[in-house]
Amino acid sequence: FDYCNFSGLFGKRIEKELKMHSVLMCLDIDHVEDIMELKQKLLNHEYFDTELLFVSPSGNGLKWIIPVDLKGWEHFRYFKAVANCIKATGLPLVDMSGSDVARSCFLPHDPQAYINPKYKDDVEENIFRPRLGECPF
């Protein structure tokens, strides 16, 4: 299985090796009774935009990738604030394992995965592409 870490670039997949935060956060919601209903609620969420949304590899949950503006907050604290907001808006609890910035996630095999339309097939720029002559690590 292929996996990725949505929250940043790392020298090694541990928090202290974080080189650059991606300004993305992966929220994992498990044991969902009605996946399509929750998917629509997340896509229409009042406070958070959706970059990517797909059925988790287990088949009974969703992985929701949202953009974040950390504004000096640590990933862990921002994650907790987002999880509390989601809970306050009546949505299911978020798996707190995502509060670990180094947490990886299996890539989706969901033919119905939502990809934000702002992304095109021919990507012109990528935040993960280092500047000329700059080592990303």
What is each PLM-predicted segment?
Residues 1-60, 68-76, 81, 130-137:
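Signature for HUH/AEP ssDNA processing cores
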Residues 24-26, 65, 104-106:
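Conserved hydrophobic/aromatic beta-strand scaffold that supports enzyme active sites
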Residues 78-92:
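Conserved short secondary-structure elements within globular domains
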Residues 70, 89-131:
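Catalytic "initiation/cleavage/transfer" segments centered on a nucleophilic residue
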Residues 55-62, 99-104:
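Short Gly/Ser/Thr- and Asp/Glu-enriched loop/turn motifs at secondary-structure junctions
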Residues 37-38, 64, 118-119:
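Short, conserved acidic/polar surface loops in the N-terminal third of protein domains
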